[in-house]
Amino acid sequence: LSDFPSRNATCISISRGPDGEEAFWVGTYDSGLFRRRGRGWEAFGAEQGFPSTSIYCLLANPDGRPSFWAGTRGAGLVAVDPAGWRTLPDHPGIASRQANCFLETQGPGGERVFWIGTDKGLVRWDARGPAMETSAHGLPGEFVTDLLEVRTPAGPEIWASTIGGIARRRGDRWEA
């Protein structure tokens, strides 16, 4: 792997294309996104029209669809699939275009819920749209660095690490 074109790798993921072929993806701090299928690297950066050169996190779709999400600085969350990429539209409920981390969970009715950690709090995006959660909601810090879902006998919990400490969400409440 000494042929990797950047020294600033930030995250890795594997996706499966429509033909079933696996692709290895690497996000970088300053050079965009790279894909490896077989030998050699294919770049997705400013020259290729990718919306950000700073990739902070990657998440393959858990349902096996040939797409994944890239969390970026400046473009927020970007959906990447065989047809190309698209950014989530600006929304007044989101205070930042920096996606440091994210997590996909299921809501009480089985619906998809996205949690996006930003430098200005945590976005919870469900069927109703996005809602920003900050220290006013119980998070110990605004800059969210990582997210984890933990299944417990009492139900699922979301854990968040922030610059300021960690917090656990049970139901609709954060505990720091």
Where are these regions (language model features)?
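Carboxylate-rich, polar loop motifs that coordinate divalent cations or form catalytic acidic clusters
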Residues: 1-176
